[in-house]
Amino acid sequence: MTLEQAELSRLLDILGNRNRRRIIELLREKPCFVTEISERLTISPKAVIDHLQMLEDARILGFRNDARRRKYYYLEHDISIQVHL
């Protein structure tokens, strides 16, 4: 497996999770912090943090801190996937 194939496989694994896709859809609307994501999607804060970490590690998300030291997550890039079989 080439490096490009491995990266694509990892990205597809990350995006294969429904909750991560829901988080991405929510962040398309506006930047959000963990509690906001948790409440809007009815997912535990711990699960949200785990999903956000994976998305951040894949460079799909970024974050910024506000004055209250809350992390606001946002999409780094618009995501579009095309599959050719």
Which sequence ranges carry the predicted segments?
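Residues within the DNA-recognition helix of helix-turn-helix
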Residues: 51
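Conserved segment of winged-helix/HTH DNA-binding domains
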Residues: 12, 69-85
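Short, Lys/Arg-enriched N-terminal segment that forms or immediately precedes the first helix
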Residues: 1-12
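Short capping segments at the starts of secondary-structure elements
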Residues: 18-20, 29-35
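A short acidic, leucine-rich amphipathic alpha-helix
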Residues: 23, 36-40
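Beta-hairpin "wing" of winged helix-turn-helix
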Residues: 57-67
